[in-house]
Design a protein with these regions (language model features):
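N-terminal low-complexity, acidic/polar interaction/targeting segments
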Residues: 17-285
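Short Gly/Ser/Thr- and charged-rich N-terminal loops/segments
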Residues: 2-10
Length: 285
């Protein structure tokens, strides 16, 4: 059995693939899914990634059960629950090894690759909780309920949102892996829930920390957690930058000393050769 691979920023390949289906979920089906309190959905366990609502992300999938789940989603034109594994190294996780809270997502595109794996483009739509897993040998399937969220007090959440955006700006300056364009996009988000989720999705933190953010249903609390995570990461990044700067200075100093030593040796060799020439002339005289 192949080990499923997960999210990557690479674009969809154009050659050597089989396009299984390109789909936009019907409006009728979307409405039904959004209004349903409880329903049964296929579950896709994820390694090393937590998908948040509003995220559009490509996933590589290789495990048989996961591929079966995606095929069922495409056949039935429904959502799928994306839930992170507690242990990314587990090739065949049990249901209790998968987090109960995940993100319902629609499948935008699915491609079958030559090596038998599948690349799928998904879009997170809502938080959801697994109530119980159903007996399905072909793929993980569970009874799922959507998780309602509360905003918090208006004054507090506005202050938290401003602080989070400002802190994210500091984080982006230190983390060169995030493009400046992302900051511009984040600064324009007016929905507080989306703001917290979008920032969290860009943070290089542990899966357990992102899962904690996903499971936080009070938006003001979620923004506060995201802010705290950024504060911690910024402290680490600042220390890393100081270390890199110190190492760079030491390397430059070592290189300068090496260059001066080599230059001195060359001068000494040159002077030695000149002394030898003088001795030879003196002997000839």
């Amino acid at each position: 059995m192949r080990r499923g691979r997960q999210a990557s920023g690479r674009p969809f390949p154009k050659r050597g693939i089989q396009l299984i289906k390109v789909t936009a979920m019907s409006e009728e089906k979307q409405t039904k899914d959004k209004t349903a309190g409880k329903d049964h959905y296929p579950v896709l366990p994820l390694r090393d990634i937590v998908v948040f609502p509003y995220m559009i992300v490509p996933l590589f999938v290789g495990r048989e059960k996961s591929i079966n789940a995606l095929e069922e989603v495409m056949r039935a034109d429904k959502h799928i629950l994306l839930a992170a594994q507690k242990n990314a190294g587990d090739d065949d996780p049990a249901t209790d090894a998968i987090y109960q809270v995940g993100t319902l997502a629609s499948v935008l595109q699915l491609l079958k690759l030559p090596d038998g794996t599948v690349k799928v483009l998904v879009e997170g739509t809502a938080r959801a909780r697994v109530l119980r897993y159903t007996d399905n040998a072909n793929y993980f399937e569970a009874e799922v309920e959507r998780i309602p969220e509360t905003i918090g007090t208006k004054t507090e959440i506005e202050a938290l949102a401003r602080s989070a955006v400002s802190q994210f700006e500091n984080y982006v300056k230190l983390n060169k892996k995030i493009s400046p364009e992302v900051l511009g996009t984040v600064a324009q988000i007016e929905d507080y829930s989306k703001l917290a989720d979008t920032i969290a999705s860009h943070l290089a933190v542990k899966i357990a920390d992102k899962q904690d953010v996903l499971e936080t249903t009070v938006v003001s609390d979620r923004l506060e957690k995201v802010y705290t995570l950024m504060e911690s990461e910024i402290s680490v990044l600042q220390v890393e930058r100081k270390i890199r700067s110190r190492v760079k200075r030491q390397m430059e100093k070592t290189q300068r000393e090496y260059y001066l030593n080599e230059q001195m040796k060359a001068i000494q060799r040159e002077l030695g050769e000149q002394d030898d020439s003088r001795d030879e002339l003196n002997e000839l005289e």
